[in-house]
Every structure is written in structure tokens, then in C-alpha cells.
Amino acid sequence: MTILFSMPVHPQPIIDSGHRFDASRHWPASLTLGFAAYPEADTRITRMNVARHYGPLRVQRAFYPEGRDGCCHVYLLHPPGGIASGDSLTIDVTVSENAHALLTTPAANKLYRADSNNVAWTQHTHLKVEDGATLEWLPQETLAFDGSRGEQTVIIDLAETAKCLGWEIIGLGRPASDLPYVSGMIEQRFQLSQKGRPLWLERQAIDPTHPRFLGKWGQGGATVHATLWAVGLSDPADTITELRDKIPANHNWAVTYRRGVLLLRYLGMERNEAWDLLQQAREILRPRLMDVKAVTPRIWLT
């Protein structure tokens, strides 16, 4: 006869890996960059003097395609290639007096579908430009998958004589794959101030279930939204005239100038059309704003 003895089972301690996959999931990443102008011989050279990162958000090295005394080009890298539920990205950039920096990305950013707990993502960007400095904020487009939920914030603080040229482009859904953006919620907030005085404040809730999404009085069903801004122009009226004369007119874009901010908007269905429009506008705006020609970042050509 076989006798079986039961051994006491001692529960093993649960080790928290720091990664959660429930409704409390939160995976942060941050990047802090600083740029300063250093005198050298009879000119100034902009160098990246601060580069701190946490998590999968970083830069490699600066490039000088316009010469050593020209604009400092830096590419923002996010190796995962997209933002998922619980991701929290924070970018802080400061361009000090008389420096000139251009920031862009190597590819489109992706906003993935929310998980089964509907956990949102967040992306916060804070850009600070000091007197005599110039910042070009030129990320490639953001592609929002159906069901994506999150909040995107851009805050720009400019000193009195600072200059800034930037844009944001978002494409909703994947129409080419017959996967439109029919669920989810993306809240975008923009805040641009100069000397602490708000010049442009905007909040846009992208909700495909709201009548505004399809209504002619709202987004009209447009799947691509783009906004370009420019601050520091000395001849805004002539600049707007040139934009309207040189860029082919259609009902998808318009340009305005109020309180020192030039805004060019696109509302349509084609990402390539929006991208081409903003590049054409930059070809006109950069010489007027910075007195240098519009050099294309190398990464856009790869």
C-alpha cells in the first residue's frame, strides 16, 4: 500500500517587475534638451549643451548641414516607433540666447489602439526660446490608429525677440487599409505665449462619435489635420501675399495672421498633400523669418 504525504505549500512572494498591464499601467519616458550659442572666432556656433533622457526617448548627435556656424539639426528618436496605452512621453527643449536649433523625427509617429482597459497615453511637449534665439519644430506626421485614446499637449514659451517656426500633422485611421478612425478620443492642446502673454490658445477634441467630426461646421470628416505656426516675421502682410501667390489654392488650406502669430491650416484627406503644403510654406517662410534658405533635413530624404 502506498501512502501519500501532503507537503505544506508556502506561497512564493510576488516580485513587482515595475511593468503593469492593467488599468494602472504607466510607462514614462522623457527627454530634456538644451541649445546654446558659443562664440568662436568671428561667429557663433550652436551646440547641444543639455541632453538628458529617461526611457526610450533620446537623441544621438547634432548635425550641421548648413555649416558649423549654421543651424544645429537634431533628430528625436523613439525606438518603439509608436505610443501605446499607458505610455507617457515628455519633451522639454530650451534654446538659449542667439542659438538656432531644428528638431525633427526620422519617421512618422504612431498612436496605437487602446488596450482592453481603455488606458490612455499622454504626450507633452514644452518648447522655450530665449531672446535672439530661433527654434524650428518640424516633426514628421503622427498617425492615429482606430481606437487610440490620449492627450497631446504643445506649450511654447517665447521671449520678446525669439523666433519660432513649427508644425504638427495628424492623420486619423489607415484609410489605405480600409481601417478608418471610428472610435477612440484624442485631445490636442496648443498654447503659445510671448513674454508670458498668451498669443494662441487652442483645444481640439478629436472624437469620431461627435457630430462635429463629420459636420461641415466642424471637421467635415477630414482625416488629416495640419497646423503650421510662425512667430517673429517682420513683414507678415507681404509674407501672406507670397504664400497665397506661390502655393496652389484649394479649399483645404488657409492662412491667417493675428497677434503676431502666422497660422496656416490644412484640413483634408491626404497626408502627402498636407506634408507637401507645409514644406512649400517653409520654403517661403524660412528666408523671411531667419534670412537663410530652407535647407531640407537629410533624414527626410531617406
Curated annotation (Swiss-Prot):
Keywords: Chaperone, Cytoplasm, Nickel insertion. One of its GO terms (molecular function) is nickel cation binding. InterPro entries: UreD. Pfam families: UreD. It is found in: Cytoplasm. GO terms for cellular component: cytoplasm. UreD, UreF and UreG form a complex that acts as a GTP-hydrolysis-dependent molecular chaperone, activating the urease apoprotein by helping to assemble the nickel containing metallocenter of UreC. The UreE protein probably delivers the nickel. Belongs to the UreD family. Required for maturation of urease via the functional incorporation of the urease nickel metallocenter. This is Urease accessory protein UreD 1. It comes from Psychrobacter cryohalolentis (strain ATCC BAA-1226 / DSM 17306 / VKM B-2378 / K5).
